[in-house]
């Protein structure tokens, strides 16, 4: 467009050359050329203004346009940055969700495995566990029965031994008492015979008899105590 305008201006200048025309006619032609040149200048100025506006206008306009474009560029850059950041955050969130889902899957699998072991495992495993528990229960029952039987036998034997020892102690005590009574009676008779053999006055014999009887009672009591202690020691 600018080349066309310049060619038109050049053609108008060449056409307005006064060398080939008379002087009066040249003046008139000069005015026409000036008018045409003024028109062309205005047209050129308008064209230049239009071109300047198309290219960015005046320096102030271009500066304002540059600032606006810079702001738009910043906005676009910020938008792309935000978009990239959101995209990265979406990727991170997706990875987090996947990781959390994997963790939940593993935890659920472990929980099911633990629950299966706690409940007894598979049907075959539960059947084997039931058989093993039944065998253990039988073993425990047999052990408790044996323990109770042995305990009962031991208690019965202990009570039998205690009763037998108690009966033996009673027999020994009766034997000791009988032997002490027999010795007391024999001693009393011997003392009486001896007193009669030795004679003495009746009062003396009576006093001697009383003393001997007291001594015999004391000896009898001593023998009884000795026999009882001996029986207790046995």
From Swiss-Prot:
Modified residues (Sulfotyrosine): 77, 141, 156, 220
GO MF, one example: neuropeptide hormone activity
Compartment(s): Secreted
Any one Gene Ontology BP term: digestion
GO CC, one annotated term: axon
Domain of life from the UniProt record: Eukaryota
InterPro entries: CCK-like, Gastrin/CCK, Gastrin/cholecystokinin_CS
Keywords: Amidation, Amphibian defense peptide, Cleavage on pair of basic residues, Repeat, Secreted, Signal, Sulfation
Location of region: Disordered: 198-234
Propeptide residue range(s): 27-73, 87-137, 151-152, 166-216, 230-234
Tissue occurrence: Expressed by the skin glands.
Residues spanning the signal sequence: 1-26
Sites bearing Phenylalanine amide, chain numbering: 83, 147, 162, 226
Pfam families: Gastrin
Similarity comment: Belongs to the gastrin/cholecystokinin family.
Stated role: The pharmacological activities of caerulein are quite similar to the physiological activities of gastrin and related peptides.
Name of the featured protein: Preprocaerulein type-4
The organism of origin for this protein: Xenopus borealis (Kenyan clawed frog)
